Amino acid sequence: MKTCSQITFASLALLIAGSSLLYTTQTSIVKAEPTQIVSSSLQTSTQRDRTAVKQAIRDTLQLGFPGIIAKTSEGGKTWGYAAGVADLSTKKPMKTNFRFRIGSVTKTFIATVLLQLAGENRLNLDDSIEKWLPGIIQGNGYDAKQITIRQMLNHTSGIADYGRAKEADFTHAKRLYTAEELVKIGLSMPPDFAPGKGWSYSNTGYVLLGILIEKVTGNSYAEEIENRIIEPLELSNTFLPGNSSVIPGTKHARGYEGYDGASELKDITYFNPSIGSSAGEMISTADDLNKFFSYLLSGKLMKERQLKQMLTTVPTGRAEIGRYGLGIYETKLQSGVQIWGHSGDFPGFSTFAGGTLGGKHTLAVSLNSMRSANSPDPYKNILLAEFSK
């Protein structure tokens, strides 16, 4: 089987959207082989014909991913489909209830907390980072007094992404990073542009936002996400693992990558997620992500004013993203349907989750290998099929 994740270190670093490195107690390398389509047995509580969706899922699998999960919720009714394998060694089939690393979908959780804090008048989105974290950004062409919370949320701050630096080693499985280290790595590079004068994806900005949440609340960003989102919504399969390399439980796929054009996929399931920090450390399931985006897009997680701010977008210049809001991006499909969500590429896993405004129709897709820099968008045709009018 052609491996989708035949990538160089450079392209891996560019692909990372809040990703983490892994901790591997026992690294195994397995040869990728043709995988069998496996549909999970699940509750199909709607009469809608999803033949086209199934075909789009199967087509995505043929791009070279070991396995894929797709699950949707529409009007309170759920549907799901799994294909391929969760484990290349044992040929264990993929299942729709498996947990996976969600990478930069973490950013939507971080943004939700900050918008809730804004709605509580505990901060202003146009506050400077210097106001809350004085001295954390100094020199090298940066002016912390001009960089705002809003700009970090929508990636217009100009802060360089630490994922582009060689010091952020996405191939080193055991390394532990602190948030301060990641920020230092990012700020060692000059700004991409003056604050508010461009758009450039910055994981560094979201790590700073995690530090800021702790400054404002006295609690870690993980505690705030748990208290404000995970517990109230009863997202029982959603975790912030911190420095733990383990995906909790046994119901999860193994994650794979093929570095530097290798024809064999390396098992990188056990992974120290500290390199992701508040930009991308989280673990979840398709059901939990659908529930989160349903609540978010229906306005149940924040005040109307804050949701309007979240959905106020700026151009990105990137076709695959479209326009970016605050921790969420807008995709306009050829069918005319507007989707709000986020993707997350994380060594071993790739994810998309989102839905329509109002939250009545959501979709979560996960792959147990990260897409390569030059591969087609693995989600585009699934989105078109699922959200066709």
Predicted regions: what they are:
Residues 90-151, 193-202, 277, 364:
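Short active-site loop at a secondary-structure junction
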Residues 87, 140-343:
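Short, surface-exposed loop or secondary-structure junction motifs
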Residues 2-27:
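Sec-dependent N-terminal signal peptides of Gram-positive bacterial secreted proteins and lipoproteins
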Residues 80-82, 93, 101, 128-131, ...:
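Conserved beta-strand positions that form and line the central face of beta-propeller blades
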Residues 74, 85, 104-106, 205, ...:
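A mature extracytoplasmic/lumenal domain signature
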Residues 30-82, 266-389:
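Catalytic loop of the DD-peptidase/beta-lactamase superfamily, centered on the K-T-G motif
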Residues 57, 76, 107-110, 114, ...:
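Residue-level preference for non-acidic, small/hydrophobic
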Residues 49, 53, 102, 106, ...:
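Hydrophobic (often cysteine-bearing) scaffold residues that line and stabilize catalytic clefts
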